[in-house]
UniProtKB/Swiss-Prot annotation:
GO terms for cellular component: cytoplasm. This is Small ribosomal subunit biogenesis GTPase RsgA. GO terms for biological process: ribosomal small subunit biogenesis. It holds the Pfam family RsgA_GTPase. It is found in: Cytoplasm. Keywords: Cytoplasm, GTP-binding, Hydrolase, Metal-binding, Nucleotide-binding, Ribosome biogenesis, RNA-binding, rRNA-binding, Zinc. It is an enzyme of class 3 (hydrolase). Residues 61-218 form the CP-type G domain.
Amino acid sequence: MKGKIIKGIAGFYYVKVEENLIECKARGKFRHKDVKPMVGDNVIIQVENGKGVIESIEKRSSELLRPAVANISLAFVVFAIKSPDINFDLLNKFLVLCEYNHIEAIVCLNKVDLVSEEERENVKKRINDIGYEVLYINAKEGLGTDILKEKINGNITVLCGPSGAGKSTLINKLTDKEHMLTGIVSEKIGRGKHTTRHSELIEVSNGYIVDTPGFSTLEIKELMEKEELKYCFPEFEEHNESCKYRGCLHNKEPKCAIKQDVEDGKINKYRYEFYVKTLEEIIEGEKNKW
């Protein structure tokens, strides 16, 4: 039987086959091959003695490692515009992760009622200028959920972002159900209390959304080689191969087209600085491997 993994908890996988949800374990062969089923996987299962067994996993179109979700076609990157303030480094990490996995990213700015229209527009422009769509939402009030449902149609959509951004509240509004516990932001540290316990696909508008555990730890230096990073910045695309030296990393090399674009104001200086900082982390990580 063919189905899709909807949820995974403690080694058990819940596979949707038509209208049925079957609890499954994975065959031992996956462990020996160092392959682990992921939420979102399309799988073939057999039912033995009333228990489901995952026999095979179909090829994945995409995957996120942290959180572990497969076959995602769209990501809502959810950040509160205030309380807590946006951590742009963390936002950039999420965007790089999406680009690396060839997943379309839409930035959803929550709690927009806490700032002025001018502040909203300034943040939106900053994100638009690097090539990403921005949607304003208010998870508590349900503002923006209609357009989000339109985007979800036909996709597996991941909601990612820092804890306290309102992801679980947003899912409750999108599904009209309390699928996840919701928490409050700790006044002491400005972070949300960890409220989501596992990754789970939830059916919405002829598609799926998946919420993921808070405090996602993103270590870009563990994901990619230094040569790959520049392709995760859409604004570099036009001139990535225009530098004097082939394989230019856009850092210390002379006559670099990207550095020239930064000087000319065509590429955001902060984004470029984030790129260089991340590149140096990857290079340092590669040194430590040996």
